């Protein structure tokens, strides 16, 4: 008789995020099992509505699409790319403990999972210094292994999710016309919906 592995302690069902943009929808698995602080912070921001109405502020063809700065609510703001979430606390959805955002909404780096910055992955943006990730992240549309936290070099960007459907939408966003990497035609995030948690 086959075993029901869904009840096994090894079985892991991560939450899904559905991104509804003005260019279409895509879905991603969020790696709560692997990077619980990063994933829990992202989910908390999604559920609070933090990301709604923000625009992709940095798009580079063959590289990535960056998103999540509160200043990008105005797609023409010259401050887009410089902001983050407010300081505060959020629940670690894996452990049940309390985590915090501090020093400008930053969270602790989670350099534990060796998921590479491969096409379709969601990865934390930062200032280039440790523990400076907040709300900004990017969608890789190419193999950007030089950004892996475990690769040599200064750039360290932990992956916290991967697109499971709608990769064509992410690629289409990466190909829009830009000026100084900012899309000429603004691309807005209408909503991010979390399911499975």
Where is each model-derived feature located?
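Cyclophilin-like peptidyl-prolyl cis-trans isomerases
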Residues: 1-197
């Amino acid at each position: 008789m086959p075993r029901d592995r869904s009840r096994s302690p090894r079985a892991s069902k991560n939450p899904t995020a559905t991104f509804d943009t003005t260019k279409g929808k895509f879905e991603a698995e969020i790696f709560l099992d692997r990077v619980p602080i990063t994933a829990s912070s992202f989910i908390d921001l999604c559920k609070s509505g933090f990301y709604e109405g923000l625009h992709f502020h940095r798009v580079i063809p063959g590289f990535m699409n960056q998103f999540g700065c509160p200043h990008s609510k105005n797609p023409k703001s010259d401050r887009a790319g410089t902001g983050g979430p407010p300081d505060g606390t959020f629940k670690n959805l894996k452990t049940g403990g309390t985590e915090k955002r501090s020093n400008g909404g930053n969270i602790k780096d989670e350099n534990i999972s060796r998921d590479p910055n491969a096409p379709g992955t969601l990865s934390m943006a930062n200032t280039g210094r440790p523990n400076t990730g907040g709300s900004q992240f990017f969608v890789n549309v190419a193999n950007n292994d030089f950004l892996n936290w475990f690769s040599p070099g200064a750039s360290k960007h932990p992956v916290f999710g991967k697109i499971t459907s709608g990769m064509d939408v992410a690629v289409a966003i990466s190909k829009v016309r830009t000026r100084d990497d900012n899309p000429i035609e603004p691309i807005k995030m209408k909503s991010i919906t979390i399911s499975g948690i």
